[in-house]
Amino acid sequence: MLFQGILYALLFLLCAVVLAKVRSPGVRQTALLAASYALYVTWGPWFAIVLLASTGMNFLVGEYLRRKPSPAILFVGIVLNLALLFSFKYLPEIAALLPLSPLHRFSHLALPLGISFWTFQAMSYLFDLYRGDDLNPSFVEFALYMVFFPVTISGPICRMPDMLPQFRSQEPTAWNDIGRGLTRIATGVFMVQLAKLLGQGILGGDGISRGFDRVTHWSGPDVWCLALGYGLQLFLDFAGYSHIAIGAAKALGFTVPENFARPFQSTNPSVFWTRWHMSLSFWIRDYVFLPLAMLRRELWWRNLALVIAMVLFGLWHKASLLFLLWGCYHGVLLVLHRQLQQAQRKFDWEPGAMWTPLSWIVTLALINLGWIFFRANSLPQARRMLSAVLAPASYPSHILSGSLYLLVTTLAAGYGIVLLIAEALDRYAVEPQGAEARSGPGFLGQLARWRWFWIPPLYALALIFLLIVTLTRGPSTAQFMYNKF
């Protein structure tokens, strides 16, 4: 949501007070719903009208599905959702390519913020009802599910079976939840600011954005630096946003899905996609890949279903050839990894001690190489960059162009910071038991054993600090890279 501004801070505090003092689920839900729509309307009443129309349509279809789980009703609901998503997200891009067509007047149609996320939430609700889940939300509960302000704009993508019991809870927000939530918010703000510095350039050096937008000739090392740097920048930005969103929800007493779990420590592509943008990855797995894979038992079909799922993953971001190729690239990587696993089992091959570090290096390289499709400004640019990577002559003796010396020196430090953040969050903010459950040895373990680290007065100080940062230097919606998707 919009994390900068007096309105967000005031509504957040108002909701926090209501959830802490009021036990009536109806009052709590109404307060959250009013605050969520008040914030969403700030981007334009038209966006709120579209969201409200989608909410009403999906609630009505859901009522029919709850009474009679019919494939025809499910089909109608999914088609209506996809038609809405297509009209606002993909039709303007198609219309822009057809200047002489009557469709061209739709080329400037504004994209409602978060439409990709709340549309997928609505479809998961319909799928779950069709599968027989016992879900009976009221209209207010369903509307809150669609517009819950911490996660409306860029996720994580929630599911009704997880959220409905929390919406109906009468328990006041626990102090431990407030502490963990503020920890996540502070971490997220820090990560987003790092992403901004990395993208714009640090200490006057060329940043990732300049590298992609201004350089027309790349050496192989230049491309590797840009790819690794962009992967780090995107992670810091999107994971930072996710920490802010998850932290805001947690500080209000709600648990929403995690979105990242140390993805850069993955040792194969399959593990990576269980750790990166997890809420979308699991959505694609549960509602696209598994239903497709179960249609036939042949290996070739399961591999094809995997590629189709990843292509849809790519096109979910944007309807362009680059994102289609990005999805195909990762689909092929996943298929190749499956084939390698089968070969290992067939020949009863036991990997040696060096297998884990080597597989980590290869996985990191392949994943980051794919970001070229994700970030390149055009297909010819992506082709030139990949050609530089694959051409030995593009690796000059000076290793790096001078403008990227400073960038490459920050990458190792950046990845190190990411590992430290993951370790700290793992101990203090993610686990339900908080710091005391993960004390362990070392400096962080000692902090976990110091009880004063978690006393309520520090929560108050942290809240005051976060309000000041949010209102002055905090990230605005326009800063988040993933908002354009």
Q: How would you describe each model-predicted region?
A:
Residues 1-484:
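Membrane-embedded transmembrane alpha-helical bundles that form the catalytic cores
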